């Protein structure tokens, strides 16, 4: 809270298909900037903020994001931006932090829920499913399927999140089949 006293704003860009909607999506995260807010209006709004802006899943919108972010940062603000993307934005001052694959379950060990709970890829999968399916947890019944899925997805966080998002519609066993 001390680092970002004005809060953390998360803008999920995976659902934005029109590059022209990037500014609107970011404006929505900052109260006081109405729909159709321009980059200049956004920059004015964030000029005095000590906040973190997270732009999630922006690989399909690299160009408009790469135009907007420097404008926001140049506003004299203490705004910080964290962009998640499979490719760099290519803007001055950008720091690239690769996210390596997570540890996956050992295929030669039985799928014991207690042992699997400590595996980071399994923990991510279960956490993401539980966010969409209240009460979902790692059990003896689903442990083998979850272990297999995480191993098949090579521990890649994005792949695990995308698979977990399909569980409400398909179920774990069907997804693993």
Segments the model singles out, each with a brief description of its role:
Residues 1-177:
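Aliphatic-rich helical/repeat scaffold segments used for oligomerization and domain docking
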């Amino acid at each position: 809270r001390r680092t970002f006293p004005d809060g953390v704003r998360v803008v999920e860009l995976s659902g934005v298909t029109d590059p022209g909607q990037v500014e609107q999506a970011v404006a929505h995260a900052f109260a006081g900037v109405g729909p159709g807010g321009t980059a200049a209006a956004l920059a004015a709004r964030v000029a005095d903020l000590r906040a973190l802006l997270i732009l999630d899943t922006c690989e399909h919108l690299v160009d408009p994001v790469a135009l907007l972010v420097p404008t926001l940062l140049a506003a004299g603000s203490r705004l910080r931006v964290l962009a998640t993307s499979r490719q760099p934005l290519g803007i001055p001052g950008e720091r690239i932090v690769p996210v390596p694959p997570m540890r996956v379950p050992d295929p030669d060990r039985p799928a014991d829920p207690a042992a699997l709970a400590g595996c980071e890829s399994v923990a991510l999968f279960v956490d993401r499913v539980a966010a969409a399916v209240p009460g979902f947890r790692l059990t003896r019944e689903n442990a083998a399927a979850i272990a297999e899925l995480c191993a098949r997805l090579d521990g890649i966080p994005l792949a695990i999140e995308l698979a977990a998002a399909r569980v409400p519609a398909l179920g774990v066993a069907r997804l693993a089949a």
